[in-house]
């Protein structure tokens, strides 16, 4: 008999041996910033990103209660030469908030946004049946989706974790998984693109040239300057947004663990149970493929107003408890890998697959039905904290199977080649999802701007009807040779699919040393993937924050 063990506890215990845990610096060595605004709560805090790879010691953190407090902080920072970095739930990987080594001496103040969490339904949306909701940037996605559900509304797709702030989600054009199924008509007030495409208006703290100071200003979706703010990478400070919402949908989610990867990711035209066949049938698919295993965990969502006879009804989110706790042999394998026994990666992959199959049966969660958010949210904060790379491959809808087939073949071949040399750079899953692009026409607002820096921003030079295949590869932090392996994956995707863009919140620009370090990707490849819209967006962000209050060294390097 095995005893469930928290995967977070496994990672924490193992990461200590790998040097990934850290302790606070001496608090006495960090004086309070000069003339800090009275009335704004603040304290010193240690920062770490989701995987624990980026951390900042003993940094001053402000906790504004209102948008006016953010304005006050911005003008103070401008006078004193500080940078402000908004933070929500810290469920991200890339150095968009702070860079490695940031500390008290760096003249950086983190701004905890979670008191900016008010929500109000503001009326019907532009399309019959849609609604609008005004929400603070610090509100959590789980809270927002619950608020909408109580009012009879929801979203077509959303990121799987509920512990994400609305502002953070919009800053990096966060997404779920959804394209129109065959014959499906888009519901009013919804999008198949990123959540940034749901914004009708937003309020940001920007420079007011007339007043010679920072001030809160509202931007309508039709304002050309709004294009750069819709997915701003943290280079701006949004305090509030008004979003579209659609009618509340009921979803069914069927999990399958019986389709071989060779069949699911077969060459286009092969027939059978291909990834594309499931996508055509329901429009909502996710594949989770553990390394060195033959059958992915395939989730297939479908719109289902009435409960199918075989489906178990659910009334809350997070219905896969086995994703948060694992049998002790699996926990032991993860710990031993982090302790240096990297050759156990194949055993860990097989153990994770076995735990998934057993968990789906034991919890009767292979066929679920309920309100949309209860099927869309399925990643708890207690899940295993791993490093993840991320890319969006933009292709015509007819090209999805070609993308997943080519990627699966390349990934498998390289994984085997590394293993033949005694190297095991990947010990986590591959995750594959598909979305539409950010079509501003879905807002039903005349002159609506597309999110200029969204990975899903349409490219006028590409054909209409494109979708994005999102590809992530996961591995435990600090796994040897992972940087080199991810560099090969990245180069393959950019070479094989010119429409590839990076997923801002995750790992990219790899060298053998790790992520966010390849100068060619940072300086040339990423900007080129956005075409002329890149320079226009960067210029707009610079105009709105000429004193560079809302930036960090990584963003200064990237957005230039």
Enumerate the language-model features and the residues they cover.
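C-terminal substrate-binding/cap subdomain adjacent to the FAD-binding core in PCMH-type
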Residues: 199-412, 416-428, 433-434
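C-terminal segment of N-terminal export signals and the immediately downstream linker at the start
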Residues: 3, 22-53
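N-terminal secretory signal peptides and thylakoid transit peptides that target proteins
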Residues: 1-18
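Glycine-rich N-terminal segment of FAD-binding domains in flavoprotein oxidoreductases
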Residues: 52-157, 287
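Structural signature of FAD isoalloxazine-binding scaffolds in flavoprotein oxidoreductases
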Residues: 94-118, 176-209, 237-241
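Conserved glycine-rich FAD pyrophosphate-binding loop
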Residues: 102, 367-560
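Short secondary-structure capping/junction motifs at helix and strand boundaries
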Residues: 83-85, 152-160, 212-217, 251, ...
